[in-house]
Amino acid sequence: MPLYKVVFDERFSASRAFAEEAERLGQSVHGIKGDMTDLWYHDLHARWTEEPAAIAGLTAHGPIFCLERLAWDHRMRVVFRVDHRYRQDGSIEHAISGPSSMLRRATALSDEINWSSEMANLVARCPATRSQTSQSNVIGPTAKRTDDPEHLISWVIAPVHRA
């Protein structure tokens, strides 16, 4: 599905790497610094009022929480979500929820040190129709970047179209 915008948090290395890869793939990216208010009032609200449009991102919990609630009023939902949690042993756990076709692709994260760049590739391929949601957990190698929080979330919000 085409993405109207890819949102990233400028404060976090993993999120910046995600944005760089999304931009390399030809996506329109928008940086925030933890607060999505400006994005909402100066872009998304008008766009979604005119016509719902899919967005994706890699952020902390706050922005996706707010965007998800705002999307409901425009008949849009979170159709893909991956919670990335750094673990004590130096690995990272990816808790994946989304279409089974994406879960199959997401299993590659178990071998991916540059997981945030791979997530940009993955969200760009999210199917346009909402299908049965599946869940999976994948643990992979990583080096925690010093400016990353313990928990980041990759997500896609899209119009609700049933398969």
Predicted segments, located by residue:
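Extracytoplasmic/lumenal soluble domains of exported proteins with redox or metal-associated functions
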Residues: 2-163
